Amino acid sequence: MTRACPWIHLPEKQNQGKLVYIDFWASWCDPCRAAMPSAKKLCKEYINENIVFIYISIDKDYNQWVKAMEDDGLNTNSNNFLALNYPGSKMYEKLKLSGIPRYLLYDENGELVHQNAPGPSDGQISSLLDEYLQ
């Protein structure tokens, strides 16, 4: 749980002391899918850094989600999740998640530091992550 965003529960032991970058996406979202190659590149660029990349799909169709994961090469990432109860969940309401793609950044203390972080294809994301990794 985070103090700044108590409705999102991050696995504390697994992510303790790490930056956490969350990508909300869906199989039917063309901009989300177009950003996936950049997301994979960003993940590889920071593979030895103290950061966790989490992908949360708001798909309602499980099979479409699985196919998109396979097509985009996310099926090997253990931090890839299918959201439940979208859009009725309190989490989505609190985040005002009215559109995707949407990116969140939590610092190493579990505090939400960017509710609308730059996307993986945005040139600003690397400098932002580097700033928090120092």
Q: Where in the sequence are the language-model features?
A:
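C-terminal structured domains
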Residues: Q14-N15, L42, S89-Y92
